[in-house]
């Protein structure tokens, strides 16, 4: 489907206090574009553009990323009347169980992950399978900044400025066969650098696996991200390559991807394997379908705290119903959650 993008609107930035209260899936583990806008800014064209991320901690960008960054299409997609979550909070309040189950564990432990060199395998039902160094994998793609809402299944949310490219561009390159119906994503499995994979949480069968229907992956909102906040992805946020599907709960957006497979059958995903009654394959943000242990009708937008929870009503498809609703026409979204 095509996205009709209305006129540009600005996203505000504001400070945020660290989150102190959150819902967590650790209990389970231990027990067994609406409002979109587009504007083309082909490079860091002005001091104002660069200053938006002046407070962002500098990373160690790989050469290929540094070379591509100046031609990024800045603010290619934005959201109206939304404050961008400050970088510190977006990088220190994370779910990435490969590095631990507490929200601060990924930032504390992910420094051990080596992201250079990095290899991505493309296989399955494609005309052009291959094994690529990440710098070669990225060569064909124009980077875009996409400012998206992020809604976690745990009922908290952020607004993140990602840098990446549409999955549809990748699919055009690899040429799916007529048998391809789904796309399967696989995270790195490396217990040496990922301490969470060495833990006693045997319920997770590594590597982490996620998937999309092919038409979902083709939607213009679905991207593969390599950066955020004007720089490369930090390790704790899924470096060097992660999925971003803003109308779905955050656990669908698999991190540190090493394999992308086109398949004919619906892949069995990690959380679906652990608790299918709680985490379905589709995982679309839906305020009408509660998690068995908490409501999904509301969310806590960071910043929030004990005395300032910053609650808001959750929007269908996380506010992207106009862009993605037709993908699920005729489906029972209570059954296919």
Swiss-Prot record:
Q: What processes does the entry annotate via GO biological process terms? A: protein repair
Question: Which positions make up the signal peptide?
Answer: 1-50
Residues annotated for Mo-molybdopterin binding in this entry = 94, 97-98, 152, 187, 237, 242, 253-255
Instruction: Briefly state the modifications made to the protein after translation.
Output: Predicted to be exported by the Tat system. The position of the signal peptide cleavage has not been experimentally proven.
The alphabetized UniProt keywords are:
Metal-binding, Molybdenum, Oxidoreductase, Periplasm, Signal
Matches recorded under InterPro entries: MsrP, OxRdtase_Mopterin-bd_dom, OxRdtase_Mopterin-bd_sf, TAT_signal
Which Pfam family would be a valid example here? Answer: Oxidored_molyb
* Xref: SUPFAM superfamilies: Oxidoreductase molybdopterin-binding domain (SSF56524)
- Supply one GO molecular-function term: oxidoreductase activity, acting on a sulfur group of donors, quinone or similar compound as acceptor
Enzyme class name: oxidoreductase
What EC identifiers does the entry list?
Answer: 1.8.5.-
Reaction catalysed by this enzyme = L-methionyl-[protein] + a quinone + H2O = L-methionyl-(S)-S-oxide-[protein] + a quinol; L-methionyl-[protein] + a quinone + H2O = L-methionyl-(R)-S-oxide-[protein] + a quinol
Question: What is its subcellular localisation?
Answer: Periplasm
Top-level taxon of the source organism: Bacteria
**CC cofactor:** Mo-molybdopterin
A GO cellular component annotation here is:
periplasmic space
Q: Where are the transmembrane segments?
A: none
Per the record, the major location class is periplasm
Give the cofactor note: Binds 1 Mo-molybdopterin (Mo-MPT) cofactor per subunit.
Protein task: Part of the MsrPQ system that repairs oxidized periplasmic proteins containing methionine sulfoxide residues (Met-O), using respiratory chain electrons. Thus protects these proteins from oxidative-stress damage caused by reactive species of oxygen and chlorine generated by the host defense mechanisms. MsrPQ is essential for the maintenance of envelope integrity under bleach stress, rescuing a wide series of structurally unrelated periplasmic proteins from methionine oxidation.
Subunit? Heterodimer of a catalytic subunit (MsrP) and a heme-binding subunit (MsrQ).
Against HAMAP family, the record matches this protein to: MsrP
Under the heading NCBIfam families, the entry gives: PRK05363.1
Q: Which family does it belong to?
A: Belongs to the MsrP family.
Query: What is the name attached to this protein's record?
Result: Protein-methionine-sulfoxide reductase catalytic subunit MsrP
In which organism is this protein found? Pseudomonas syringae pv. tomato (strain ATCC BAA-871 / DC3000)
Q: Upper taxonomic classification of the species? A: Bacteria, Pseudomonadati, Pseudomonadota, Gammaproteobacteria, Pseudomonadales
